[in-house]
Design a protein with these regions (language model features):
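A short, mixed-charge helix-start or loop-turn motif at secondary-structure junctions
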Residues: 9, 108-111, 152
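Conserved anion/nucleotide-ligand pocket segment
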Residues: 139, 152-158
Length: 190
């Protein structure tokens, strides 16, 4: 029997753009992959993020079973507004239990760029999620090369298929974490 899964997507760009469209395809595939999957999308826009917005976003992340982080790549790194949000997500200190809204959750990274040259720019984000927040990152990162801006170009069929597989894998990982309490015991080491 499938357990309910709630997926929250944080999109570090404007609604309707290339990153948003690719994240949308992932969310649609995840929702369609099993009964009981619900999705919510948060658009960070250009920032800056005020404290009230950050607190609301953190509550949304805490209530999620799986998270998608969508970001365009600029100068071989992920969007500054996503970095700003993650820097303000609580995790706990050395004397605490390292609890936080991303700990032991399935997290999928969806990135877009104008070329393949920016692909490795997500590595610091993977490291942050796994080592600092104690999240389970869905491999591999979904990276889409989209050369037109504004979200009006047709999506490459191969990329669309990858997005479907990625969405299904995200929900499958979140379901596995829910079913096996040992996976939920993961803790950040530092």
């Amino acid at each position: 029997m499938d357990t309910p899964i709630h997926v929250v997507a944080v999109v570090a760009s404007q609604a309707g753009g290339n990153t948003d469209r690719l994240v949308g395809r992932v969310l649609e595939a995840g929702r369609d992959s099993q009964a009981g999957v619900t999705v919510t999308a948060i658009h960070l826009g250009a920032g800056p993020l005020d404290q009230a917005r950050v607190e609301g976003y953190v509550q949304s992340l805490a209530g999620a079973d799986a998270v998608v982080l969508g970001t365009p790549m600029y100068r071989s790194t992920y969007a500054a507004v996503l970095k700003e949000l993650l820097e303000r997500v609580p995790r706990g200190g050395p004397s605490e239990r390292f609890e936080g809204p991303l700990r032991a959750k399935a997290v999928g990274i969806v990135a877009t760029g104008g070329s393949h040259h920016h692909f490795l720019g997500v590595d610091p984000l993977i490291d942050l999620l796994v080592r600092y927040f104690g999240a389970y990152v869905v491999p591999p990162v979904l990276y889409g090369v989209i050369r037109s801006s504004g979200g009006d170009a047709p999506m490459d069929p191969g990329l669309a298929e990858d997005a479907v597989r990625f969405g299904r894998a995200l929900v499958a990982l979140a379901s596995a974490i829910q079913r096996d309490e040992r996976l939920g015991d993961a803790r950040a080491q530092i």
